Amino acid sequence: MAYQAEYIWIDGTEPTHKLRSKTRVVPDGKKPPVWGFDGSSTNQATGHFSDCVLEPVFTCPDPLRGPNDVLVMCEVLNADLTPHPTNTRAAAVAVAKQYASFEPMFGIEQEYTFFQDGRPYGWPEVGFPAPQGPYYCGVGGTKMPGREIVEAHTLACLRAGLAVEGTNAEVMMGQWEFQVGVLSTVAVGDQLWTARWLLERIAEDFGVDVSFDAKPIKGDWNGAGAHTNFSTKQMRAAGGWDAIIAGCEALGTRVLEHIENYGDGIKDRLTGAHETAPWSKFSYGVSDRGSSVRIPGGVARDKRGYLEDRRPNANVDPYVVARLMVETICGAAASTKPAAKPTAKRAPATKAVAKKATARKAPARR
């Protein structure tokens, strides 16, 4: 019997890419094949040369359909099968291979806001709800609108086999969070984009929209972020504290590059208020949610673990944030590694007399 494959891809909408999808019926026993779409309708091509290619890269069970149906996350390619300019995954794959020896791992805390009829879900038609305070991790029918969608989304992610670690209500009414991880550089993007698609698709059934805007409501209301937890095997190992501090220092050397790629509207969110650091000032500290990068208290006690970059927006591309963090942190660590110790290389012995081996110094890494 044939099955349904829902092909999901990232479009070319600016300044924030959106998700698109369409269904293909695939014969039983066959894998989802390479497919295509009209790029002129997704801001990825012009009308006179509009063919774009969908290359399957991640497949998981479709929790919304039958037991044999699947979700298929795709890379977008040009007609000549080179990565499309909107394809940020390809660059993440290259960086992951380059720094594979560091074994970088990620966990991303995805915040978002439900909207209905142009205002946050559950807000009064006129005016505002009660000030922030009771909503974060709260409970109660009048304070927690959207929980039924959150529960359905969490169950769907689990049935799909996605590495969802948890959910919670956030500081502003109508705002929620789920966490994905711990996953490798590319896998965290594959699974977070898939989880985002499931969230929007499920909210659709409730007549509710999902916003990943960094500051969906102006004023004294929290923005929405995607705090990104990062570690290498050196950080996770006993005595990894020095590697964690080195990672924080490395992030401080490329501040503007990260800020410019951490999502649209970041300057509206990173103001120094509402548990953020000013976008223009880099800082890190233990247990400090007002810093750019937080080192959890438990990590400081254990002297090993991970760091949390609190700057990425909710609308950040996870492939981009993962690539940048690996490039910056692992790249800095690789450039400061000491040269290998010289080793003696023995020359082959002859029948007359064995030649004395001479030490050869290993070249320093550049």
Residue ranges, per PLM feature:
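Low-complexity, polybasic segments enriched for Lys interleaved with small residues
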Residues: 339, 343-364
